[in-house]
Amino acid sequence: MGKHETSYARVERDLYPTREQWVTEALLAHVDLSGRSVWEPAAGTGDMAEVLKAAGAHVFCSDICDHGYPLNAVGDFTLMDMGRRFDAIVTNPPGGPRNGLAEHFIETGLQHIARGGLLALLLPADFDAAGRRRALFAECAAFRAKIVLTRRIVWFVRPDGKREAPKENHAWFIWEWTMLRGRTAPSVFYAPTDPNSGD
C-alpha cells in the first residue's frame, strides 16, 4: 500500500518512517557519507538516521516535533538556521497537500547547501515530472542525480496479516552545487542492483 491511498487517512504531520534499511542503503551505494556531517531534518523515529550513523556519518537530527527519537533540535526545517554548515542534508520529507511541503523542503535545502554540500531527498519517482517543478529540476543547475529504487517501499504493515503490496515507486533526488560554469546533465542510477535483496 502507498502513502496516500484514498482508503487510508493521511498520517498526522505526514510521519511516514523509513523503516526499511535498504532504502537508505540505496542512497549510500552511490553517495559516500562516511565521516561526513549530515543533517536529518525530518528524523521522525530515527530509522534513516540510524542507517546513516552505521555507515559512519556524523548525524545531526531534528524534526518539527518529538516522536520519541533523541533529537539535537526541535523545529520546522523550512524556518531553521542552525548557524553551521553540514556536508549533506538527507531526509524523507513530508509531502503536504499536493506535495507543496516537499517542494518547500527542496527550496530550503538548496539555500542551506548554497555554500557547498549535498541535498538528498526521498520522493515519489515521478516528482520531477510536474511542469511547475522545472525550476527545481530541469532548470536547476544544482540538480545532480536521481537514484531510482528498484523495489517499492512498504510504509504500513497490514492489520490483516497479509503481505503488503505497495503501489508507489520512489527515488532519491540529489542536488549539489559545483564551481562548474553551466549545467551538466543529471545522472540516473538504480538501486538496489538486486531488486529481490532483503525479501
Where do the PLM segments sit?
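Class I S-adenosyl-L-methionine-dependent methyltransferase catalytic core
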Residues: 1-199
